[in-house]
């Protein structure tokens, strides 16, 4: 987007011309927001690493912002880029703070796109942690696909786990 790129260049100019100043600090804060909104957190990390002054971009913050950027794309209803962003998040942060959330969204996107393999993969990842907030929904989606594939014993096992969760 042209507007983003122009704003980025203007803020970069402030940071490089006035390193260490309050203006540079505010410019970096605004740059971070722009890059998150544009789903380009990796570019911000690279930029922060090369900028002069006391600029730090911690890995935990990069983890969080990468996830937040992907979630924003999903919330806009853009399933394909969201799928790509969540997949990239999981590749970069396989045990990241938001990995369960990312697997959940990929599971939902898979269901929306009728991609049974994606649903099974990501629901399976969610079910590795049976007490997570998404486990009931994951059991339901997982069991439904197994049932439709006539894998009744496996589907029944999922439904029994779901029943046990729903009654507790």
Regions found by a protein language model. Give the residues of each.
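Acidic, polar-rich low-complexity tracts and alpha-helical solenoid repeat scaffolds
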Residues: 1-168
């Amino acid at each position: 987007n042209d507007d983003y790129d122009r704003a980025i260049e203007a803020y970069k100019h402030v940071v490089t011309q006035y390193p260490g100043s309050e203006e540079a600090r505010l410019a970096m804060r605004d740059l971070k927001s722009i890059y998150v909104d544009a789903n380009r957190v990796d570019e911000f990390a690279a930029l922060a690493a090369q900028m002069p002054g006391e600029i730090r971009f911690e890995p935990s913050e990069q983890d969080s912002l990468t996830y937040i950027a992907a979630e924003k794309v999903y919330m806009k209803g853009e399933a394909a880029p969201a799928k790509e962003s969540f997949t990239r998040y999981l590749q970069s942060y396989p045990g990241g703070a938001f990995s369960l959330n990312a697997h959940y969204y990929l599971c939902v996107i898979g269901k929306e796109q009728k991609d049974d393999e994606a649903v099974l993969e990501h629901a399976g990842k969610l079910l590795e942690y049976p007490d997570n907030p998404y486990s009931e929904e994951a059991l339901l989606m997982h069991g439904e696909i197994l049932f439709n594939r006539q894998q009744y014993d496996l589907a029944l096992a999922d439904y029994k786990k779901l029943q046990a969760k729903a009654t507790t």
